[in-house]
């Protein structure tokens, strides 16, 4: 996709599922149940350009979304999209509360401690029952798991992609 400015990646088609045209999508989005719900408008980013599709049905299966698009009836119609990314239009994103963020606003953000020392870069977000956990890649060390709670996360500057945390004792061990 040449211009992704008004589009947001929500997943990647990793494989087909069965012979009736379903695809397995590895979601990299918050609100996945809304992104892939029946009637949702998505765009497949192909080498030939962006192709609009509409979700006919979807379900979660083994941490992947199995999605069938309207008009697709067999594997031959969809197999060519294996490996392609799936996007939503930017206008499809609702406003969030002040202390809530979209994944793409957090991923690749630099994490620093209260003194401004770099800890690492957020590479992934893990959803847990209580709160999200940011997986921070550190240079020459194992990844740090940063819980998205008020006691730890002190500020998030989405525009600067900078997150300041209070590295509580034992958090970075």
UniProtKB/Swiss-Prot annotation:
Any GO MF annotation of the entry: ribosome binding
One Gene Ontology cellular component: ribosome
SUPFAM superfamilies per UniProt: PRC-barrel domain, Translation proteins
Keywords attached to this entry: Chaperone, Cytoplasm, Ribosome biogenesis, rRNA processing
Pfam families: PRC (PF05239), RimM (PF01782)
InterPro entries (alphabetical): PRC-brl_dom, PRC_barrel-like_sf, RimM, RimM_N, RimM_N_sf, Transl_B-barrel_sf
GO BP: ribosomal small subunit biogenesis; rRNA processing
Compartments, as annotated in UniProt: Cytoplasm
Gene3D superfamilies: PRC-barrel domain, RimM
UniProt superkingdom: Bacteria
Domain PRC barrel span(s) in chain numbering: 98-171
Subunit structure: Binds ribosomal protein uS19.
Free-text note on domains in this protein's UniProt record: The PRC barrel domain binds ribosomal protein uS19.
Role summary: An accessory protein needed during the final step in the assembly of 30S ribosomal subunit, possibly for assembly of the head region. Essential for efficient processing of 16S rRNA. May be needed both before and after RbfA during the maturation of 16S rRNA. It has affinity for free ribosomal 30S subunits but not for 70S ribosomes.
Stored HAMAP family: Ribosome_mat_RimM (MF_00014)
Family: Belongs to the RimM family.
NCBIfam families from the UniProt entry: 16S_RimM
Official protein name in the record: Ribosome maturation factor RimM
Organism annotation: Leuconostoc mesenteroides subsp. mesenteroides (strain ATCC 8293 / DSM 20343 / BCRC 11652 / CCM 1803 / JCM 6124 / NCDO 523 / NBRC 100496 / NCIMB 8023 / NCTC 12954 / NRRL B-1118 / 37Y)
Lineage: Bacteria, Bacillati, Bacillota, Bacilli, Lactobacillales
């Amino acid at each position: 996709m040449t211009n992704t400015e008004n589009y947001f990646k929500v997943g990647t088609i990793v494989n087909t599922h069965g012979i009736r045209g379903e695809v397995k999508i590895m979601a990299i989005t918050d609100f996945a149940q809304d992104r892939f719900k029946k009637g949702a408008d998505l765009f497949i980013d192909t080498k030939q350009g962006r192709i609009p599709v509409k979700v006919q049905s979807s379900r979660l299966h083994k941490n992947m979304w199995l999605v069938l698009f309207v008009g697709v009836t067999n594997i031959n119609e969809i197999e060519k999209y294996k490996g392609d990314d799936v996007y939503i239009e930017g206008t499809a994103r609702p406003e969030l509360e002040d202390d809530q963020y979209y994944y793409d606003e957090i991923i690749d953000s630099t994490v620093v401690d209260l003194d401004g020392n770099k800890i690492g870069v957020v590479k992934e977000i893990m959803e847990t029952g209580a709160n999200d956990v940011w997986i921070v890649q550190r240079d020459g060390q194992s990844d740090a798991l940063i819980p998205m709670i008020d006691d730890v996360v002190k500020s998030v500057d989405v525009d600067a992609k900078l997150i300041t945390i209070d590295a509580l004792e034992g958090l970075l061990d």
